């Protein structure tokens, strides 16, 4: 076997007359990766188009704003090719706000349930759950759902629901009579 090839395989192309043939690593490419809160929460596969190429990307669950997802070998041309660096940008969510690992949202509670207590349905990033409303719950009260927040290195954060009391927009005559009776009883007591 040719000794020149043998030494190039052992020590690289820079020895024994291989100068100038050394290849360079391709440049890393940076691109923005906009994600919904649900996509960032659950993770999964996503196909993105960067520089005219479609690339399949694995998104880890619980990825954060500003995190960088590296896709090896999908950057600029070279030997070896550079990497593709995708910088995560979380899109605004219509319901939830993320702070650290905790999520915040508003929970609409009908007035009768706020007064006497009961159960209402609340949304989480994993789907709906039933929340127990204690009697005489005031507007603005924060209810904490442990472990229903965002995943992170120290486990899951919490979901904080701020109570917003709602009153019915339409009443049947019977319901209106009951509300009037309730108002009379309240004013008689005051």
Where are these regions (language model features)?
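Non-catalytic interaction modules of co-chaperones and other macromolecular assembly/maintenance factors
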Residues: 1-190
